[in-house]
């Protein structure tokens, strides 16, 4: 089973590496993990940081201009492979380690 984590980002140069490193470290026992980044037209150095750290995610899709979180989420859903899908904001508001609790249900 694939557990897809969609990460919509907009101007997250200060937090993007930390969140992606935390997601990469997640060790699911029952799921194969898929990390999808959606760059929602960032105008800071987020795009450059993502391009320099491709080993931290499985795929990236970009919107040329900022269309809002809803558009980023919809784009991510179009490209996911997972049977289970979650959204992880890049601003570190939620602890990525909490995603491991999903395995307790299965």
PLM regions with names:
Residues 2-4, 34:
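Cell-envelope/extracellular polymer assembly enzymes that use nucleotide-activated donors
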Residues 99-106:
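Conserved donor-nucleotide/metal-binding helix-loop-beta segment in metal-dependent transferases, i.e.
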